[in-house]
Amino acid sequence: MNSNKMTINLALFGMTQSGKSSAGNIILGSTDFHSSFAPCSVTRDCSLGRSCHFRSFMRRGGQEVTLQVQVLDTPGYPHSRLSKKHVRQEVREALAHHFGQEGLHLALLVQRADVPLCGQEESSPVQMIQELLGHTWMNYTAILFTHAEKIEEAGFNEDEYLREASETLLKLLNSIQHRYIFQYKKGNSLSEQRLKILERIIEFVKENCYQVLTFK
């Protein structure tokens, strides 16, 4: 293994039309994942995308590191066409296939900022994360809020938004040590969005001492 190169492995989870595939494309700087508005679930299968190599993006042990990001996109959960059992099995197999040995650095729960996270809704994607990642899931999970520009349009800033959040969301944030990222589209180029998201992801991975979750 080349100590001057590093691969960060991510998996995206979330409800249908939460913006998972679009967020994955922004992180990768590509159009690997099909993303579109639809009245039903768009993603039916798990898919792995890889970014180009980022040179001198970060330092580790005093040396510059070339970074590559791998992102696993997963079907929405619950899905409009597939059973919960089918989706869980599909994702379980994909995690084992792609990250079985290399390990997963971070699971991103993709949540629309303009859709309140309530108890019944929270039970689905979060429940799947808990089941598939195991009892240490909270150490490897962060929330990615998409459509964050809606917060500003409503007259809130990020802190005010979180203070007014549902009890369900606040409990979830507490359990994952307040790891969250806001994704803005309005007024930001794709490269700016990507850079800000990647910087936060690297921050979380560093705080976790670069540990990974492996799958058998």
Swiss-Prot record:
Residues annotated for GTP binding in this entry: G14, M15, T16, Q17, S18, G19, K20, S21, S22, S35, H147, A148, E149
Translocase listed as a keyword: no
Protein name (record): GTPase IMAP family member GIMD1
Keyword set includes GTP-binding: yes
Pfam families attached to this UniProt entry: AIG1
The species this protein was found in: Bos taurus
Limits of the AIG1-type G domain: 5-216
Family label: Belongs to the TRAFAC class TrmE-Era-EngA-EngB-Septin-like GTPase superfamily. AIG1/Toc34/Toc159-like paraseptin GTPase family. IAN subfamily.
